[in-house]
């Protein structure tokens, strides 16, 4: 097992990509902790994947985030791996139709929320080193025609640059920071973004050289590489998975 007894925190781990990552990491021997404000969904996921520990926490609340980290440290003694995965997709709107509340909601969850968790974790991780994995998107690397999600793409591009910055800042503490840029993945969140899921999935699949859209498992195995000692000499890397 590649993650035997490692303590892993996965934000957004109760569904979609985060759930797939959590499930694989548990199989690899990790003690996985999932924070979320949706307790019902948390309990369901924790039971399904045999999750070690789950905590009610709103990623938009500094107090909730700090309390969650304090509970984890008290119970497990430290955090070896942080997966910054939580994220939401906006309703498709062009720039002139976006109001500040729309913008702020996406930025608060997709960017500032990841900052909150990383800041709270890194103080403890500095003691023994660790790995931070940021889940971004290919929408943070390039623009797509008719994809009206300005706050989303801004948040994902920002996570890419924070990956590079944090990798340099904390290399001397033996903390590796890497990023995965996922393309279109078959999740409930992605499907809710499309008006006609079946047609959109088929058309999107055709745009990929391998002829299909991604699965949570595709992203989970890429995350496992960055979480494990297989990538012990890798930091600041941006890995497209598409």
Where are these regions (language model features)?
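C-terminal substrate-recognition "lid" of short-chain dehydrogenase/reductases
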Residues: 2, 175-176, 212-241
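Conserved glycine-rich cofactor-binding loop
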Residues: 14-15
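A glycine/serine/threonine-rich, flexible loop-to-helix segment
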Residues: 47, 146-148, 179, 184-207
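Substrate-binding pocket helix/loop in short-chain dehydrogenase/reductase
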Residues: 93-95, 102-105, 200, 204
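Active-site helix of classical SDR
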Residues: 118, 155, 163
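Alpha-helical segment proximal to the catalytic Tyr-Lys
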Residues: 123, 168-172, 232
């Amino acid at each position: 097992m590649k993650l035997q007894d490692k303590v892993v925190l996965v934000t957004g781990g109760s569904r979609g990509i985060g759930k797939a990552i959590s499930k694989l990491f548990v199989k690899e021997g990790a003690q996985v902790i999932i924070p979320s404000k949706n307790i019902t969904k948390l309990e369901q996921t924790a039971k399904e994947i045999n999750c070690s520990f789950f905590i009610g926490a709103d990623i938009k609340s500094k107090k909730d985030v700090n309390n969650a980290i304090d509970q984890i440290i008290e119970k497990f003694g430290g955090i070896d791996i942080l997966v910054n995965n939580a994220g939401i997709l906006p309703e498709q709107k062009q720039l002139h139709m976006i109001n500040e509340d729309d913008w702020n909601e996406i930025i608060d969850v997709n960017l500032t929320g990841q900052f909150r968790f990383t800041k709270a974790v890194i103080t403890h991780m500095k003691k023994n080193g660790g790995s931070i994995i940021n889940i971004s998107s290919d929408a943070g690397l390039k623009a797509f025609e008719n994809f009206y999600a300005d706050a989303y793409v801004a948040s994902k591009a920002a996570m890419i640059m924070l990956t590079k910055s944090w990798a340099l800042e904390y290399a001397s503490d033996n903390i590796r920071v890497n990023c995965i840029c996922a393309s279109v993945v078959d999740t409930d969140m992605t499907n809710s973004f499309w008006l006609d899921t079946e047609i959109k999935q088929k058309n999107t699949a055709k745009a990929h050289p391998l002829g299909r859209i991604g699965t949570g498992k595709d992203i989970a195995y890429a995350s496992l590489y960055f979480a494990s000692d297989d990538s012990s000499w890798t930091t600041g890397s941006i890995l497209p998975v598409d």
